């Protein structure tokens, strides 16, 4: 944008001359040519002049500050609009035309501001200072606040130029009304059209396209910001879900629910076979998880009060004292979980009458031996009902309890096994060489309780009767031959499968490792 070229200036001067000629021809009576009926050609020429490309809008109006007057009126007066401004400029143009056509007439030398047309078309649309500035350019001065009076000398050329610019202002209002009709659906107001027209050198079509593109860009930006806001809110919700504290309550699904309650159950103590937990263990010992099975030599030793000389090997002198340790256990198992039909007190009473078994461990050879404590009297008891002599506490004929001799008093120091390790070592040596020792009279001091020895027999884990000759290799459950065929479908508690029973004479010393220490 810049100053108009000489061609543009010449085009404006030609239009001004045609405008003056058009209005002067209305009052010229000397010429016989036909008067022009409409100023349509002047309007088209004025539109072309106002739409000249690359011409600064400042040079469109020189005597009237058109865009400033329109902006102040639209902002300050609620009754003002582009159409109302078009009417106000048209009335002021009429005042100027009458003044330069009939300067001698007195009615045009004064303008009453309280008349109806002036109040309705001019004062309701334009500000008072703007009206005063325009009329001052024509030669009018305000008088007593109710009228404008013409000065003595009238500059006809100045009045013609002001009237011509008022004509251009009227045409410019028509163009801005056309632009507003094209872009009002985009949310533009008349004031936005005036601002765009004031700063743009484009014609009507160019201004309309520019406003439409700007509106579309604003809509696209708004939509993009809305999408960004939605994505941000969605990401915030996802982050809240991700960092939400986890529920520590177990799931209600089948697996988690079952595992939760299985972990809450107390450990089931198996009491169906020869499994036993040690009463007192040494924390420093590295005990192996193994099951010790009875051997023929152990059974031979258990049948004799003094044992067999081939069972306990001589201890090496280099091992020193405290190599032989003893732990007390009961020979009978706990109540059967499968065939328990009698009160538990009965079995507790029977357990109190059963003899004890001592387990001796030799640290030098890592062997476990099973033997019964020495007895001072016969282990056979006679049944008071049928008169049958039995080695166990239960009659094998009538299943009645047998009366056993009273047990000897426990040792004064039952739990101090470490202080009697040398005594136990000496007892084992005297047991192997009976001719050079004085007997095993001091051995009972190592135990917490001594009872008459009996022939070791295992009770069936199903029927609780003596004579169990089969043992499960997985859970150590024992069974007799009769129950082995009757309960072959019984599941093993160690694994989710059936029992694997084997005869006792075919068992090895080691079996499948369990998660607990088992002594036989």
Curated annotation (Swiss-Prot):
A motif (PIM motif) lies at residues 327-344. It is found in: Cytoplasm; Nucleus. Residues 301-323, 434-458 are annotated as: Disordered. Residues 84-156 form the PUB domain. Changing residue 114 to A: Reduced interaction with CYLD. Keywords: Cytoplasm, Developmental protein, Necrosis, Nucleus, Phosphoprotein. GO terms for cellular component: cytoplasm; cytosol; fibrillar center; nucleoplasm. GO terms for biological process: necroptotic process; protein K63-linked deubiquitination; protein linear deubiquitination; regulation of inflammatory response; regulation of necroptotic process; regulation of tumor necrosis factor-mediated signaling pathway; seminiferous tubule development; spermatogenesis. One of its GO terms (molecular function) is ubiquitin-specific protease binding. Gene3D superfamilies: 1.20.58.2190. It comes from the Eukaryota. Present at high level in Sertoli cells, but not detected in spermatogenic cells (at protein level). Low expression in spleen, thymus and prostate. PANTHER family: SPERMATOGENESIS-ASSOCIATED PROTEIN 2, SPERMATOGENESIS-ASSOCIATED PROTEIN 2/TAMOZHENNIC. Belongs to the SPATA2 family. Interacts (via the PIM motif) with RNF31/HOIP (via the PUB domain); the interaction is direct. Interacts (via the PUB domain) with CYLD; the interaction is direct. Bridging factor that mediates the recruitment of CYLD to the LUBAC complex, thereby regulating TNF-alpha-induced necroptosis. Acts as a direct binding intermediate that bridges RNF31/HOIP, the catalytic subunit of the LUBAC complex, and the deubiquitinase (CYLD), thereby recruiting CYLD to the TNF-R1 signaling complex (TNF-RSC). Required to activate the 'Met-1'- (linear) and 'Lys-63'-linked deubiquitinase activities of CYLD. Controls the kinase activity of RIPK1 and TNF-alpha-induced necroptosis by promoting 'Met-1'-linked deubiquitination of RIPK1 by CYLD. This is Spermatogenesis-associated protein 2. It comes from Homo sapiens. The gene is SPATA2.
